[in-house]
Amino acid sequence: MSKASKQTTYRVDGMSCTNCAGKFEKNVKNLEGVTDAKVNFGAGKISVYGETSISQIEKAGAFENLRVTDEKDYSSKPAKKESFLKKNWHLVVSIIFIILAFISQNISGEDSTTTIILYVIAIVVGGFNLFKEGFANLIKLDFTMESLMTIAIIGASIIGEWAEGSIVVILFAFSEVLERYSMDKARQSIRSLMDIAPKEALIRRDDVEQMIAVSDIQIGDIMIIKPGQKIAMDGVVIKGYSAINQSAITGESIPVEKKVDDEVFAGTLNEEGLLEVKVTKHVEDTTISKIIHLVEEAQGERAPAQAFVDKFAKYYTPTIMLIALLVVVVPPLFFGGDWDTWVYQGLSLLVVGCPCSLVISTPVSIVSAIGNSAKNGVLVKGGIYLEEIGGLQAIAFDKTGTLTKGKPVVTDFIPYSEHMDEQNSLSIITALETMSQHPLASAIISKAMIDNVDYKSIEIDNFSSITGKGVKGEVNGITYYIGSSKLFESSLEKSQSISQTYQSLQKQGKTAMLFGTESNILAIIAVADEVRESSKEVIAQLHKLGIAHTIMLTGDNNDTAQFIGKEIGVSDIKAELMPEDKLTYIKELKQTYGKVAMIGDGVNDAPALAASTVGIAMGGAGTDTALETADVALMGDDLKKLPFIVNLSRKTLKIIKQNITFSLGIKLLALLLVLPGWLTLWIAIVADMGATLLVTLNGLRLMKVKK
């Protein structure tokens, strides 16, 4: 590989905005020895092509005090946290001076020297970084959002509207704080993925067992996993039998039985037996490593949508300035107009053209809507996501923990014995399960406790596990069995009705177990992941809102998925999916429908959440990674909040359009008043301030939208 084509990836701490990331990328590209560079803002990474040093890269990011670390040496431990006050002192100080200015204004008046000085300090402190960027862009005639905000604040200051200027500064500074917080949390969640799998494993080499770091484990090594341990590497079982909790990887709610030749994944939990596993992948190729990579790549692909106002400013602001200049010079030079009159008209046009109402029209609506959604238990991580929800054409749901409760419970108990009632049967079943360490034992024990079944007094003798079938034990000299149909093949052949019931429960996506003696089946007990009571109602509401495409995605088997999907009423069902399958399907949905949301709660959902137009997590049941990777979190595990946020988003979009239309309409009307020379500074101020006030009040209406 040539030096020019050599690629090195570095972790970057301190990137707080997309503009900073773009500037950093440009600076690195200009370094000697670097042929190209690409920043992944979402993951906090930069890929550098060519050869350079970390010190040189850090110099390229010195304007933001960026800290750079080679990804190979990067620690998964979170960086030392700075306090909110330390990181955002400029915002806090600015707010304090605005409060002091309000007090001074009420005592001494808005034109008093003290009031003006306090407002000036608030504007300078809160908007210092904004002004630096804004003026730099204006010098280059690059009319970005920063330059638009700078002109808005200066315009407000020139006409003496110090309060308005300071509020605009605060709104912009606060939006930057939210952006930085969201990105910091997202990066922390990605780092936490690295801690799912152990950093070392017990490996047998040449009949010697030793702990070896995962980076030194080779394909073909024999890994020994004891009960209760997490699996460090992907591999295939060569000896042993166990139940593996792999919900963090595949999303399956119920631990999966693993036997010889079955595949196991790094980061999953061995709950029951001793396993020997042959390693099949290097650490960088494991399933969990792929998930981390997919999350970071998906985050990097999502470019921040440029708001309409930011795009419009490139044409609006210079156009207003040009028109004002023409108003000042054309009438006096070519038509003999009075200079004083037309300078006044030009100044009035600049005042009415001040984009304050235009600038505020969107953020006031977004802030109000986000505040309302938070009060109603929906956390939205940015205005762009709130806007995107309003245009959703399809929503994909993870099954486990989202449409279902994510916790197995006993759904059916069917007794068949005339001599043993349900209480006695359940007491023996529970006593056996407490000794078995079966993955579903917790569901049976919970039912026994709810039904006040006395199972602790049952004495079990000669207990033993029957590998791959179930367990058995003696109670008062009678041997009882509980397990799969393999334990009762002869009894099932004799009873067609019991066999049909058992098969029917299995087809419903439930895990059915038989309880009985060597000669008779005494009961069937079925366990399943319960559907949330609200799921069917929520899907119906979404269909009424016009979102016709609702898709259930799951790692569970097809029978379970089909039964639950039809019960809930989703329009499509996709089962037996791995994380990469979910990601691929989300990308396909985006190509078909445009704007697509993904709702999930597990680590396996993280790539799909990141790749969707809007990633939505179930708060409470959701893992930290899903919550932080997602753009929206439904707190309290309440799926019913989904139709609310869709409705709120649509109303937000409607009000934003109203505000922008009204703001521009007022300015157009004022422009028409220039032609006959009727525009006065008083009319300009009233029009500008009136528009600002009205769009603000209109935006605040979003605080009142209810569920």
Curated annotation (Swiss-Prot):
Record-annotated HMA domain positions: 6-69
Pfam families: E1-E2_ATPase, HMA, Hydrolase
Record-linked InterPro entries: ATPase_P-typ_cyto_dom_N, ATPase_P-typ_P_site, ATPase_P-typ_TM_dom_sf, ATPase_P-typ_transduc_dom_A_sf, Cation_Transport_ATPase_IB, HAD-like_sf, HAD_sf, Heavy-metal-associated_CS
Keyword Transmembrane annotated: yes
Reaction catalyzed: Cd(2+)(in) + ATP + H2O = Cd(2+)(out) + ADP + phosphate + H(+)
Domain of life: Bacteria
Gene3D superfamilies: 3.30.70.100, Calcium-transporting ATPase, cytoplasmic domain N, Calcium-transporting ATPase, cytoplasmic transduction domain A, HAD superfamily/HAD-like
Any one GO CC term of the record: plasma membrane
Binding site residues for Cd(2+): C17, C20
Localization, UniProt: Cell membrane
GO molecular function, one term: ATP hydrolysis activity
Annotated keywords: ATP-binding, Cadmium, Cadmium resistance, Cell membrane, Ion transport, Magnesium, Membrane, Metal-binding, Nucleotide-binding, Phosphoprotein, Translocase, Transmembrane, Transmembrane helix, Transport
Keyword presence, RNA-binding: no
EC number annotated for this UniProt entry: 7.2.2.21
Active site per UniProt: D398 (4-aspartylphosphate intermediate)
Protein function: Couples the hydrolysis of ATP with the export of cadmium.
Protein name from the UniProt record: Probable cadmium-transporting ATPase
Taxonomic lineage: Bacteria, Bacillati, Bacillota, Bacilli, Bacillales
